[in-house]
Swiss-Prot record:
Pfam families: SNF. The modification Phosphoserine is found at S13, S20, S665, S701. Belongs to the sodium:neurotransmitter symporter (SNF) (TC 2.A.22) family. Expressed in the brain. The strongest expression levels in embryonic, postnatal, and adult stages are found in both cortical and hippocampal tissues. GO terms for biological process: alanine transport; brain development; glycine transport; L-leucine transport; neurotransmitter transport; neutral amino acid transport; proline transport; protein catabolic process. Glycans are attached at N186, N393. It catalyses: L-proline(in) + Na(+)(in) = L-proline(out) + Na(+)(out); L-leucine(in) + Na(+)(in) = L-leucine(out) + Na(+)(out); glycine(in) + Na(+)(in) = glycine(out) + Na(+)(out); L-alanine(in) + Na(+)(in) = L-alanine(out) + Na(+)(out). Residues 698-710 have a biased composition (Polar residues). It comes from the Eukaryota. The modification Phosphotyrosine is found at Y377. Residues 1-68, 117-140, 244-251, 323-333, 472-494, 550-569, 642-727 are cytoplasmic. This is Sodium-dependent neutral amino acid transporter SLC6A17. PROSITE patterns: NA_NEUROTRAN_SYMP_1 (PS00610), NA_NEUROTRAN_SYMP_2 (PS00754), NA_NEUROTRAN_SYMP_3 (PS50267).
């Protein structure tokens, strides 16, 4: 430690140096505490340690602008689920009526918990491991669980990007390769591929040409080399986007976050001009109010809110940790949440405008096929021509005319009617067909685009949008893995990031087998749902009940410069934990009531069949959930019995129990005890104080406090005035 003038004079005169703590700090020249050497209390022989400043933020990267940060949060939270899951849930759960429970739960669960993660990340300026270690060391396992969940999600999520890459490259041809069934040679006769003839061209292309899928999860079938190459491309894209941290990913976000909105806007305009688009939108938003009383609707709405904002992954915390301390994260939480909701509604409009068009196409096809059946029955005298209304013209048969004719035949030929095999061809039935996930993106949407003018252009735009949506979410997911590990273990950023991508690619080969789609279903449905719910409820408890909601609100007031709404106090303290507990219980009950299974594509039947997971797959599923949640009890037990150090003796800064921030500027000037904290290891460490008045960077030399009348400073020594980062 650099010597002040008094100490220098006494050392030159060989006098015995005795300084109080206050004198040493008050007369100190500017100092760089990162190289200070302290004697730590409780260590035998006065062993010296280099106190590396754990919460140093001098070298921490920062966002180039507020816009870049907001786009990163939007890119992470707005993902493929907004495009293919929210519209499905909206249709399934009452149309416009579903928006009511969704909005209510967004306000009482989504925004408060999103704000909580933004606040702790911004204040403590560490990834998920460091943040929860500082808030409550015994719950430090939360951060490790978040990393594991991010790894599980990243493994299969990038496979979906790989699928989109495959379709993207296949879109540069006319006609689109999934617009017609392939023709095969059977000797000298050309016939349509039977599997395609029984299903549809787009369904066949997805299951056979793209996935080359096996009949069950137990039939591996070997690697699909086309998807293996696409997965390699996907991980290469992600690796290049995140290898330099936010310096590289931040720039990528300008395109990956904004481009999907351009595409959605173009699709909406084009979709509204399609015949039948209004039918789809009206069907979508026609409220079925009785659905609002169904508990299942509220459970699914809560789950969607929960995952739509990316809570519990650690990506939100990682991104906010690169913010300035005085950033208004209160505003950010509301802004990102409502942009997310707006995106979901926009995507729903686009999806059902397109599906309304598709429903009209399919309904007209149904009318033509059944009209041909009726003509056959008329020609064979199975039906009398007297049953056909006189104004019906088979050459220009409308949907209305067919419905009238169908009703007459069904009434007159009541007993023989089932044997005729006629369909009602109702538009409502087509619109009611629930489509979600890969079925929406790679079957329903691709089929609709085959009927678009200039279909290759729209196909390229659509799959490029999916790639960008997936990339934005993957950047946040990778940040949830790399940021806490790099912060905690100080590993080289570039090397660790590249290593993660290479490791994930090789593990991801599991998902590009012929049975890989079934593993994607398993990971998507079960590997993250329950663990993330547990993670977020423990985050809420750690801040609201262990640290204390009142103290947390005080810290936010100091950090933001204004007091957040009292609304958040009650949400964090009571409402959100209760809702999360109910959601966790409901998820566990759902697992027990409905045995886990998957939809398998049976080649011989050219149809899907729901199968239950075999015993080994159930064991894998349970292992995934256990591995994701195991760090929480393990770290708790190890720290409870003092088998794992909380690292307090290696920190240059220790913290009073139950305080995240300590501003010493308001303390009494002559109170020397203000520089000495409790020897009890911190239960809630915190970042550096907001206001620092007199110390700045400078040269250092070792500080030997063995002659100090107060004894060794111990682990409670407070670096009250280390310069605050410009971040």
């Amino acid at each position: 430690m650099p010597k002040n003038s008094k100490v220098t004079q006494r050392e030159h005169s060989n006098e015995h140096v005795t300084e109080s703590v206050a004198d040493l700090l008050a007369l100190e020249e500017p100092v760089d505490y990162k190289q200070s050497v302290l004697n730590v209390a409780g260590e035998t022989g006065g062993k010296q340690k280099v106190a590396e400043e754990e919460l140093d933020t001098e070298d921490r990267p920062a966002w180039n602008s507020k816009l870049q940060y907001i786009l990163a949060q939007i890119g992470f939270s707005v993902g493929l689920g907004n495009i293919w899951r929210f519209p499905y849930l909206c249709q399934k759960n009452g149309g416009g009526a579903y928006l009511v429970p969704y909005l209510v739960l967004l306000i009482i669960i989504g925004i408060p918990l999103f704000f909580l993660e933004l606040a702790v990340g911004q204040r403590i300026r560490r990834g998920s491991i460091g943040v929860w270690h500082y808030v409550c060391p015994r719950l430090g396992g939360i951060g490790f669980s978040s990393c594991i969940v991010c790894l599980f999600v990243g493994l299969y999520y990038n496979v979906i990007i790989g699928w989109s890459v495959f379709y993207f490259f296949k879109s540069f041809q006319y006609p689109l390769p999934w617009s017609e069934c392939p023709v095969i040679r059977n000797g000298t006769v050309a016939v349509v591929e039977p599997e395609c003839e029984k299903s549809s061209a787009t369904t066949y292309f997805w299951y056979r040409e793209a996935l080359d899928i096996s009949n069950s999860i137990s039939e591996s079938g070997g690697l699909n080399w086309k998807m293996t190459l696409c997965l390699l491309v996907a991980w290469s894209i992600v690796g290049m986007a995140v290898v330099k941290g936010i310096q590289s990913s931040g720039k990528v976000m300008y395109f990956s976050s904004l481009f999907p909105y351009v595409v959605l806007a173009c699709f909406l305009v084009r979709g509204l001009l399609l015949r039948g688009a209004v039918d789809g939108i009206l069907h979508m938003f026609t409220p079925k109010l009785d659905k609002m009383l169904d508990p299942q609707v509220w459970r699914e709405a809560a789950t969607q809110v929960f995952f739509a904002l990316g809570l519990g992954f650690g990506g939100v915390i990682a991104f906010s940790s690169y913010n300035k301390q005085d950033n208004n994260c209160h505003f950010d939480a509301a802004l990102v949440s409502f942009i997310n909701f707006f995106t979901s509604v926009l995507a729903t409009l686009v999806v059902f405008a397109v599906l309304g068009f598709k429903a009209n196409i399919m309904n007209e096809k149904c009318v033509v096929e059944n009209a041909e059946k009726i003509l056959g029955y008329l020609n064979s005298n199975v039906l009398s021509r007297d049953l056909i209304p006189p104004h019906v013209n088979f050459s220009h048969l409308t949907t209305k005319d067919y419905s009238e004719m169908y009703s007459v035949i069904m009434t007159v030929k009541e007993k023989q009617f089932p044997a005729l095999g006629l369909d009602p061809c109702l538009l409502e039935d087509e619109l009611d067909k629930s489509v979600q996930g890969t079925g929406l993106a790679f079957i329903a949407f691709t089929e609709a685009m085959t009927h678009f003018p200039a279909s290759p252009f729209w196909s390229v735009m659509f799959f490029l949008m999916l790639i960008n949506l997936g990339l934005g979410s993957m950047i946040g997911t990778m940040a949830g893995i790399t940021t806490p590990i790099i912060d905690t273990f100080k590993v080289p950023k570039e090397m660790f990031t590249v290593g993660c991508c290479v490791f994930a690619f090789f593990v991801g080969l599991l998902f590009v087998q012929r049975s890989g789609n079934y593993f994607v279903t398993m990971f998507d449905d079960y590997s993250a749902t329950l663990p993330l719910t547990v993670i977020v409820i423990l985050e809420n408890i750690a801040v609201a009940w262990i640290y204390g909601t009142k103290k947390f609100m005080q810290e936010l007031t100091e950090m933001l410069g204004f007091q957040p709404y009292r609304f958040y106090f009650y949400m964090w303290k009571f409402v959100s934990p209760l809702c999360m507990a109910v959601l966790t219980t409901a998820s566990i009950i759902q697992l027990g009531v409905s045995p886990p299974g998957y939809s398998a594509w049976i080649k011989e039947e050219a149809a899907e069949r729901y199968l239950y997971f075999p015993n080994w797959a159930m064991a894998l599923l349970i292992t995934l959930i256990a591995v994701a949640t195991l760090p929480i009890p393990v770290v708790f037990i190890l720290r409870h019995f003092h088998l794992l150090s909380d690292g307090s003796n290696t920190l240059s800064v220790s913290y009073k129990k139950g305080r995240m921030m300590k501003d010493i500027s308001n303390l009494e000037e002559n109170d020397e005890t203000r520089f000495i904290l409790s020897k009890v290891p911190s239960e809630a460490p915190s970042p550096m104080p907001t206001h620092r008045s007199y110390l700045g960077p400078g040269s250092t030399s070792p500080l030997d406090n063995s002659n100090n009348p107060n004894g060794r400073y111990g682990s409670g020594y407070l670096l009250a005035s280390t310069p605050e980062s410009e971040l």
